[in-house]
Amino acid sequence: MTNIIDQINAEQMQGKEIPDFNPGDTVLVQVKVIEGNRERLQAFEGVVIAKRNRGLNSAFTVRKISHNVGVERVFQTYSPIVDSITVKRRGDVRRAKLYYLRNLAGRAARIKEKLSGKKGD
């Protein structure tokens, strides 16, 4: 039974192209929004503060500041609502979950940019 479930999960994950990103990275997520009878793409750009790797049930949390209010949104990685994910900037952090950023504002909430040391990175 579990083999069948794993096989279905693998099929669902196969068609989606997900870039490699980590907490601390700034990403641009294109989300499909349906308004009435038309569909459009809405951009949500922010810092990844958490990532949950669970196969088909994988998710990540993106935080941005909009009009001086912190906005967090949790995206299911393989959801059909998520059209594309683009990594804008790599962040250099030492934590897997960056929940401490919720309590910081302005310059204190900045994340150092990761300098690529290797050619492939």
UniProtKB/Swiss-Prot annotation:
Highest taxon of source: Bacteria
InterPro entries registered for this protein in UniProt: Ribosomal_bL19, Ribosomal_bL19_CS, Ribosomal_bL19_sf, Translation_prot_SH3-like_sf
Function, as annotated: This protein is located at the 30S-50S ribosomal subunit interface and may play a role in the structure and function of the aminoacyl-tRNA binding site.
Lipoprotein listed as a keyword: no
Listed GO CC annotations: cytosolic large ribosomal subunit
Protein encoded by which gene: rplS
Alphabetical UniProt keywords: Ribonucleoprotein, Ribosomal protein
Name of the featured protein: Large ribosomal subunit protein bL19
Biological processes per GO annotation: translation
Gene3D superfamilies: 2.30.30.790
PROSITE patterns: RIBOSOMAL_L19
Family assignment from sequence similarity: Belongs to the bacterial ribosomal protein bL19 family.
GO MF term set: structural constituent of ribosome
